[in-house]
A protein has these predicted regions:
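Extracellular/periplasmic helix-exit of transmembrane alpha-helices
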Residues: 110-118, 123, 219-237, 251, ...
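Flexible loop linkers connecting adjacent transmembrane helices
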Residues: 33-60, 84-94, 106-138, 319-337, ...
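N-terminal alpha-helical transmembrane segments of multi-pass membrane transport
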Residues: 1-76, 87-92, 391, 422-462
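Membrane-interface loop-to-helix entry segments
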Residues: 19-26, 31-43, 165-171, 178-226, ...
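Transmembrane helix-loop junctions in multi-pass membrane proteins
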Residues: 30-35, 77-82, 91, 155-168, ...
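Extracellular loop-to-transmembrane helix junctions
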Residues: 5, 9-45, 87-124, 300-306, ...
């Protein structure tokens, strides 16, 4: 554990925070702050339904691709990750979580647009993501292979261990359920769904995600309304702990910054290279459409759902001395607000949040296993290993699974950020093309690869 923690310190303190913020600021400027200027367009695009392919097959719709990415994003990071960030970094961590979401959404636009641009045709849907744009766009197949290995490990193994660990911790706290029994049930459910393929994952995600998100946000809004007089004080607490002199002298600002960005990235995945795998599956007329929709997903995750958790914890007066950490802190906070049923509600909500994340995480791994090899036995073996890691996570300690996830997440994000820095110019050209068509009165812009002759030969699906 000490060795893993030392690697984490190097990656997060000296490399990733600088790269994340640097890329986020750069792309915000280059896109003229697309994440703010085109919010209304994002909402309109989300309603687009699946179209028919040339052979008449049904594709994954914009909403389903959005649901897959939200299924992965909205999970443990929103309930347990936010609580961990506050417990370790203080309330100021929430401010930096907001910052990385607001600025990092531009990176999400770039990577998801590139995922659409360089996608290829799969058996039952389109397939794409960073591994594909590294190979086809950067002409660096070794880099694509490295990324594919990293994301397959990060999402299929490390992140899914975190999800199952948190589900079991919450269930034990609320119901006294044995970890082994619940871990076995989770593993069985996971295997049944993932062996059904992307279409089954898309259908399940598009049902679970809206219901669970609306239910959780609705409860949080009730709590905010009941504590509305305390809202200015909570916001002031968040800001003061992000910049206060007392915190700066104690090293608290740096801890808040690191925890906010680390847990924010785990939750919203902006710039990490995961969402492009979901974005690439959608059947749309222009790559920029999925870029815009995935930008909205970042806001939905962090500014809405993570903020709900933060307010629930800070309104409750739950101790932030480190005596309670992770999902138990969220459960204790909600119990303080609505009584003993709060712990049960968190356990149930977390089951759906985290289980949908397991499905979304698995799909990211599958898309990249298919990049590495088309051998069916490898894919089946990967599915079984994913189930095994779900079981492992249910039995492991909290610190172990979070530390492993932090290392693999950092390596994956660094690899992707390097790629989008070089390829981002193409996403910006696509954004300009989309804006020009909208300005010309075209209601639904259409991209034709002939408009980019310098890379036309690398684009399979346009």
């Amino acid at each position: 554990m000490t060795f893993i923690n030392e690697i984490n310190d190097i990656l997060w303190t000296y490399i990733l925070i600088i790269m994340l913020l640097g890329c986020a600021i750069w792309f915000s400027i280059r896109t003229r702050f697309v994440q703010f200027r085109m919010i209304c367009e994002m909402i309109v695009l989300l309603s687009e339904s699946a179209g028919k392919g040339k052979q008449g097959e049904k594709h994954v719709s914009s909403f389903q691709a959005f649901a897959i990415s939200i299924a992965s994003r909205v999970g443990t990071g929103n309930l347990a990750g936010v609580a961990t960030a506050i417990a370790i970094g203080g309330p100021g961590a929430i401010f930096w979580m907001w910052v990385i979401a607001l600025l990092g959404a531009s990176s999400a636009f770039i990577e998801s647009t590139l995922g659409q641009l360089y996608k290829i045709r799969g058996k039952d849907s389109f397939i794409g993501g960073p591994a594909y744009y590294m190979k086809k766009g950067l002409k660096q197949p070794w880099m694509g292979m490295l990324f594919a290995i990293l994301i397959s490990i990060t999402f299929g193994f490390a992140f899914n261990s975190v999800q199952s660990n948190t589900i079991c911790a919450a269930a034990e706290h609320a119901f006294g359920v044995n970890h082994i029994i619940l871990g076995g049930v989770l593993t069985l459910l996971t295997l049944v769904i993932i062996f059904g393929g992307i279409q089954r994952i898309a259908r399940v995600s598009s049902i679970i995600v809206p219901v669970m998100a609306l239910g959780y946000v609705g409860l949080a809004l009730v709590i905010v309304i009941l504590n509305i007089t305390h809202l200015p004080g909570v916001i002031a607490l968040i800001v003061s702990h992000a910049f206060g002199w007392e915190q700066a002298l104690a090293g608290g600002v740096g801890m808040a910054l690191m925890q906010g960005i680390k847990r924010g990235l785990f939750s919203n995945e902006a710039g990490m290279g995961s969402a492009p795998n979901a974005a690439a599956t959608a059947h749309v007329s222009h790559p920029a459409k999925q870029g815009l929709i995935q930008t909205l997903a970042v806001f939905t995750d962090t500014l809405l759902i993570c903020t709900c958790t933060a307010f629930i914890i800070l309104f409750s007066g739950a101790p932030l001395d480190g005596s309670t950490n992770g999902v138990q802190l969220t459960q204790q906070a909600l119990t303080n607000e609505i009584g003993s049923s709060g712990s049960v509600f968190v356990a149930v909500a977390l089951f759906f949040f985290a289980f949908s994340s397991i499905l979304g995480n698995y799909y990211y791994g599958e898309a990249n296993i298919r990049f590495i090899t088309h051998r069916k036995w490898v894919l089946h073996g990967y599915r079984i290993l994913v189930g095994g890691m779900v079981l492992f996570g249910s039995l492991a300690t909290l610190d172990m699974v979070w530390s492993l996830a932090d290392v693999t997440m950092a390596l994956m994000a660094i690899c992707n950020l390097i790629a989008i820095l070089f390829l981002g110019k193409y996403a910006i050209r696509l954004l300009n093309d989309y804006r020009a068509q909208k300005k010309a009165g075209i209601q639904s812009p259409v991209f034709k690869k002939e408009s980019m002759p310098d890379i036309e030969k690398d684009l399979e699906c346009w």
